């Protein structure tokens, strides 16, 4: 089916272009969401009549989207979740969680505007793209951690797989175990010469 695009559609075309798409995509997505018109002679004439209005509305919406993008751009969102010692989350961080975190900061975006390939299932940082307008995109950094302290350590770039206190305790335990099993250290403590 041929359609006339009423706005820019990613990987398809710009506003005003006549493109050929599959019937299901046209009916279920483009026409339903008023992103396109069927490319009939009547609709082509109708589009030419409303072209100036559509372009003016697009420029206005793009300007508003640019203002919102400035607020969002480079923002760091922290999401606290329970996770195993290996960093696997007990659950996941989805688009809904990102939208809710932005809403808590006073920024309103809808779920379809957040582009997340798959839910986040591990602790760490991930860049997420937000398309506020078909021509305006920005990104945020989502930091997933077990606690606020751990989130700060992740932001600083520290290795969070093991804590520094745990590494120090392990080194002390190895040193103590080495003395415990060293026969010379045991004999010196007992005051006896080493038997050979």
Curated annotation (Swiss-Prot):
Q: RNA-binding: present as a keyword of the record? A: yes
Q: Which UniProt keywords apply?
A: Ribonucleoprotein, Ribosomal protein, RNA-binding, rRNA-binding
- Organism superkingdom: Bacteria
Q: Report the GO terms under cellular component.
A: ribonucleoprotein complex; ribosome
Task: State any GO BP term from the record.
Answer: translation
- One family name in Pfam for this protein: Ribosomal_L9_N
Which residues form each disulfide bond in the chain?
Answer: none
| Example GO molecular function | structural constituent of ribosome
- Tell me the function of this protein: Binds to the 23S rRNA.
Please report which protein family the annotation says this sequence is part of: Belongs to the bacterial ribosomal protein bL9 family.
Please report the name of this protein according to its UniProt entry.
Answer: Large ribosomal subunit protein bL9
Q: Which organism is it from?
A: Bradyrhizobium sp. (strain ORS 278)
Q: What is the taxonomic lineage of the source species? A: Bacteria, Pseudomonadati, Pseudomonadota, Alphaproteobacteria, Hyphomicrobiales
């Amino acid at each position: 089916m041929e359609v006339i695009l009423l706005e820019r559609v990613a990987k398809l075309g710009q506003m005003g272009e006549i493109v050929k798409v599959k019937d299901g995509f046209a009916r279920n997505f483009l026409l339903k969401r008023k992103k396109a018109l069927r490319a009939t002679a009547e609709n082509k004439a109708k589009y030419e009549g409303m072209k100036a209005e559509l372009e003016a509305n697009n420029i206005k919406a793009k300007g508003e989207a640019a203002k919102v993008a400035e607020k969002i751009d480079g923002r760091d969102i922290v999401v606290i979740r329970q996770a195993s010692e290996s960093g696997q989350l007990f659950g996941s961080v989805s688009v809904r969680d990102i939208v809710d975190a932005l809403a808590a900061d006073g920024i309103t975006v809808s779920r379809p505007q957040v582009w997340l390939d798959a839910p986040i299932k591990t602790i760490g940082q991930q860049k997420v793209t937000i398309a506020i307008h078909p021509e305006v995109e920005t990104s945020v950094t989502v930091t997933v951690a077990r606690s606020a302290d751990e989130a700060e350590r992740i932001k600083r770039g520290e290795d969070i797989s093991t804590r520094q206190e745990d590494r120090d305790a392990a080194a002390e335990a190895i040193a103590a175990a080495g003395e415990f099993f060293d026969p010379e250290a045991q004999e010196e403590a007992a005051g006896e010469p080493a038997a050979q």
